[in-house]
Amino acid sequence: MSDAVQTGWQLSEQAPLRTLNTFHVEATARWLLNVQAPEALPQALAAPEIAGQPLLVLGSGSNVLLAGDPPGCVLCFDNRETSIIAHRADHAIVRAGAGVNWHALVLYALQQGLSGLENLALIPGTVGACPIQNIGAYGAQVGDFIHVVEAFDRHSQQFVRLDAADCAFGYRDSVFKQQPERYLIVAVEFNLPLLHELRLDYAGIREELASMGAELAGAADVAQAVINIRRRKLPDPDVLGNAGSFFKNPLLPSEQIAALQASFADMPVYPGEHAGQGKLSAAWLIEQCGWKGKREGDAGVSPDHALVLVNYGTATGAQLLDFARRIAESVRERYSVILEPEPRIIGAHW
């Protein structure tokens, strides 16, 4: 592997990616670009080895499945600065570089007396990746707290600032996911309140707080409750390869929901993102089809959470993808519901 080192960036050839994705599957980048100084990005992208080539941005690789070697160049941001850039009477603006660990940012905000992100504690990944998927958990979505996304626009070759409306946030969606080849996120600014109405009505948070003896809960207590729940339900990707929840919870029109409930009375249904729709539990659908805890070779579904696809050791990305496709097909056959993957599939089509 040859290396080219420049001010603020480094280019490596034939770089292994196993440690750069949380499924821990083997893949190789023809070129790997590490950027420490975002202002050097235009110069780095103009390097003759990678100019004009396809570009894949990897944070910690916690929301991708490498089903093959990515074409072109893999880009990793290594800017890890976090600071409060503005104080207001009831909130503050926190700026974090794309390379900052997401959970570290949540803890930083809590240490500064700021709330809003506590339900998103312990989600693997980096700050730069969080707007792409509009990460969410336990009743919260990061898009509700994003003030500005700073990005390099590959179309205009300019650095731009996109406010929350420009980002077009939706359920596990954003303009960055819709146009993956256009924007390279270099930093995110968050609008975080000093006092925030806590979200306690999701997935056993109240029960966990009670077991902690935290009847008068604050944001830090909620974060600890979420951490406890996640550690019990979700495998540590450092120990067992996974990307968290592999499938989105399906959003369906109310009429389709009613028809399903007429046939499957015990099917849980949750409020949708908009009027006239409901949300199904993908985990429930998968478990009902018999996949929870199932294993074939080193590809499997966690015995603790039916949404979590796991690599027990040497499964390839292609094997994991085939396993996931068969899960989705069995759900479609039984319930006429189409499951969509949360992670971005690289090197193959879903």
From Swiss-Prot:
Chief location bin: cytoplasm
Gene3D superfamilies: 3.30.465.10, UDP-N-acetylenolpyruvoylglucosamine reductase, C-terminal domain, Uridine Diphospho-n-acetylenolpyruvylglucosamine Reductase, domain 2
Listed InterPro entries: FAD-bd_PCMH, FAD-bd_PCMH-like_sf, FAD-bd_PCMH_sub1, FAD-bd_PCMH_sub2, MurB, MurB_C, MurB_C_sf, Oxid_FAD_bind_N
Active site: R172, S245 (proton donor), E342
UniProt GO cellular component terms: cytosol
Catalytic reactions on record: UDP-N-acetyl-alpha-D-muramate + NADP(+) = UDP-N-acetyl-3-O-(1-carboxyvinyl)-alpha-D-glucosamine + NADPH + H(+)
Domain named FAD-binding PCMH-type: residues: 24-195
Biological process (GO), any one: peptidoglycan biosynthetic process
Highest taxon above the source species: Bacteria
Top-level enzyme category: oxidoreductase
Entry cofactors: FAD
E.C. number(s) listed in UniProt: 1.3.1.98
Single Gene Ontology MF annotation: UDP-N-acetylmuramate dehydrogenase activity
Cell compartments where the protein resides: Cytoplasm
UniProt entry keywords in alphabetical sequence: Cell cycle, Cell division, Cell shape, Cell wall biogenesis/degradation, Cytoplasm, FAD, Flavoprotein, NADP, Oxidoreductase, Peptidoglycan synthesis
Pathway entry: Cell wall biogenesis; peptidoglycan biosynthesis
Job description of the protein: Cell wall formation.
Family from the record: Belongs to the MurB family.
Protein's UniProt name: UDP-N-acetylenolpyruvoylglucosamine reductase
Organism: Xanthomonas axonopodis pv. citri (strain 306)
Biological classification of the source: Bacteria, Pseudomonadati, Pseudomonadota, Gammaproteobacteria, Lysobacterales
Gene label: murB
